[in-house]
Each structure stands twice: as C-alpha cells, then as structure tokens.
Regions:
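Beta-propeller domains with acidic blade repeats across secreted/periplasmic ectodomains
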Residues: 1-254
C-alpha cells in the first residue's frame, strides 16, 4: 500500500485504493511504472482488512477513479479510461480509452478526486497550469488553468462544469439537497459549486462566492458530508475536511 491517493467503498463494503509509487513521474529508461488499483476486504468481520486483491496493475498515476456497474473509470493521463472485469473475478481484463486530450505536464494537477453525483455522472478536478482540449462526440471541450469536469457515461458527454480562479481543486461533495461543493487543496478554501457552474465562453473565469466553510489550514485532501449510520446522530450532515499537511487531521463543520 504505497502512496495511496484515492479510496472508495463499494456496495459490498470493500475498500478500493489507488496507489501511485511512481509519483511524480517515472524516470526515462528505468522500469515501466507499476501503479495499482487495490481491493481491501474484511472477510471475517473483525473490522480489519485481511485480504488484498490487485484489481489492476502496470498503471501510471491513476490519481482518480470512480466505481460503476460497467467497470471502474480511471485517470491515465492524457486519457480517461474504463477498466472492465469481464469474468467478475476481481481482476480487470480490459482497459478502454474513452477520452483523450487531458493535459499531463503537471501530474499532481491532472484529472483527479473523482466523485459521482446522484444522477450517475461523475466529476473530475483539474489544477492550475494545465491546458486540456478533449475531442468528444459533442465537439471539443476545453479547460484552462484549473476547473472541474463532469462526465455523464449514459450520454457519453463530457463538459466543463466549473472554471474559476482555482489553484488545485481536490474534493467534490454533495449535500442532502444535491448541491455541489468544491474544495481547493492548495489554498485550503471551500466553495459552493452551483454559482460557479454557469456556462461561460472558454477562457473566461467565473468569480467565486464567499467561502462555504472556514479555512483552518492547507491543503485540503478530501471533503464529505456525513450521511452514514457509522457516525452518531449529532454528526449527521456535518461537513468534513481532511488536511494532509497543516494539522494532519479531519475537521468537522456544522
């Protein structure tokens, strides 16, 4: 479990983790990168993972993924890919390239922090300094200097959901009313997503609203609204912010 970057639970209670020991990039001429997508499972229900399965290996910087009935959507810059397990043995059999053209020259700003909305579409964050141009059946889609993508698998439609003065957005979450919130890792700030999502001409940034949650320290490495019975009643609906450098913990906001 080297250099984990994103995790997600499936509907069987198993924890999927993307690991990127090749970060920030592999050395030309050295061995090819072997980043992985792992499945951790508690088979005897003692609260500890006792089984590890390598769902996919020989990857390069899978810094974002999203589980879906048809497979696992995955970052493999410059591509958005789909890992498919044809025989349901918990090992990917195929990797399909769905979209091409996501910028690659700053690996920790590339499409990441995947999060699905209630409709089944999912969001991908992209940081500053990148200039992506992706060909789609609906025409080219572009994102410049930081933004949030939305991909709808049912329509095979990619769109720029938000483009504003972001540094490195790394966290998308939805509240009880399905409103979107966007967190910026570099600055540690948190923004209400809806006012930033209006369709604007390419290259025009949308001004931000006031911060949704107070900044304590940077950077933000994940956010979520509590809606699980694993947490007590008094925690339900609270906004959780994970910090990976400042105070090295998780803050709760009601």
């Amino acid at each position: 479990l080297a250099s984990p970057v994103q995790m997600s639970f499936d509907n069987r209670g198993r924890l999927w983790v993307a690991v990127i020991p090749s970060y920030p990039h592999y050395k030309p001429g050295a061995e090819r990168p072997n980043d992985k997508l792992l499945i951790l499972e508690d088979t005897d229900n003692d609260g500890k993972a006792d089984k590890q399965t390598v769902f996919a290996d020989k990857l390069h910087l899978p810094i974002g993924f999203e589980l879906a009935p048809e497979g696992v959507y995955l970052s493999q810059e410059p591509n958005l890919c789909l890992l498919v397990d044809d025989d349901q043995d918990d090992h990917a059999d195929r990797l399909e390239i769905l979209m091409h053209g996501f910028d690659t020259h700053d690996t920790h700003h590339a499409i990441s922090a995947y999060c699905a909305d209630p409709s089944g579409a999912f969001y991908m964050c992209e940081g500053r300094f990148l200039h992506s141009q992706v060909e789609t059946p609906y025409g080219p889609q572009r994102c410049n200097d930081g933004g949030v993508w939305r991909f709808d698998p049912a329509k095979f439609k990619l769109e720029r959901y938000s483009q504003s003065d972001y540094n490195n957005p790394w966290g998308i979450s939805f509240d009880y009313w399905e409103q979107c919130y966007i967190s910026d890792a570099s600055s540690g700030e948190n923004w209400w997503g809806l006012p930033l999502s209006a369709k604007m001409p390419y290259g025009i940034e949308i001004p931000k609203t006031a911060e949704f949650a107070p900044k304590r320290s940077r950077p933000t490495s994940g956010v979520e609204f509590v809606s699980s019975r694993h947490f007590p009643d008094e925690a339900q609906g609270h906004f959780m912010i994970c910090n990976s450098i400042g105070f090295l913990g998780t803050s709760f906001h009601d």
